[in-house]
């Protein structure tokens, strides 16, 4: 007997339009009505996951931040596994000389270190790299006017140096970096 259904969000629960299809929502409700527990398992932080689900009536458990935070059906934190600030600093110090975007993810916000202009450029690159289909208009004005761009901006705290992250005493659950320079990324790993 099935007791739990866990679903990823991007490309699984959410379609290309970043919405839950009506037939998927119906299936989730039918499973829950049959006594099967439903949960979201995603690399997103909790706030980012909730942003995508706000127009649904899904009540579920959450495994977010690639497993670093677990929340119950009432959205209360059940457990966390944050990275130590020392490890975050070591990662940052080892990567800061490379031309990559480094994102420190917490339960509520993503923290990016740099100037406002640098970070806004990184938003643009992120969307063009990961979120735009090859058939979509990927020019700067199309990206800047997209709802996805607005969500990324709203879910990001821009800080000028690592010390600000340390002083914020936020729990970092995941460090994410990206670049379209695959050769350089290979050197880092």
Regions inferred by a protein language model and the residue ranges of each:
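Conserved acidic, metal-coordinating active-site core of Asp-based
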Residues: 98-100, 106-189
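Short, Lys/Arg-enriched, disordered terminal segments
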Residues: 1-3, 33
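Small/polar loops that bind or transfer phosphate-bearing groups
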Residues: 16, 40-41, 177
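Active-site phosphate-binding/coordination module
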Residues: 22-139
């Amino acid at each position: 007997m099935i007791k739990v259904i866990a679903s990823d969000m991007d490309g699984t629960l959410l379609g290309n339009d970043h919405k839950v299809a009506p037939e998927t929502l119906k299936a989730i409700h039918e499973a829950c009505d049959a006594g099967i527990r439903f949960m979201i398992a995603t690399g997103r932080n909790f706030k980012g996951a909730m942003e995508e689900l706000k127009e649904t009536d899904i009540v579920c458990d959450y495994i977010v931040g690639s497993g670093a935070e677990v929340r119950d059906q009432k959205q209360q934190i059940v457990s966390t596994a944050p990275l130590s600030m020392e490890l975050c600093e070591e990662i940052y110090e080892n990567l800061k000389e490379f031309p990559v975007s480094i994102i420190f993810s917490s339960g509520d916000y993503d923290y990016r270190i740099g100037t406002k202009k640098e970070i806004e450029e990184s938003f643009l690159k992120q969307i063009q790299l990961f979120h735009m289909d090859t058939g979509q208009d990927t020019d700067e004005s199309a990206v800047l006017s997209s709802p996805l761009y607005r969500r990324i901006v709203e879910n990001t705290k821009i800080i000028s140096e690592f010390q600000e992250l340390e002083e914020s005493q936020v729990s970092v659950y995941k460090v994410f970096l990206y670049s379209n320079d695959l050769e350089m990324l290979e050197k880092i790993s």
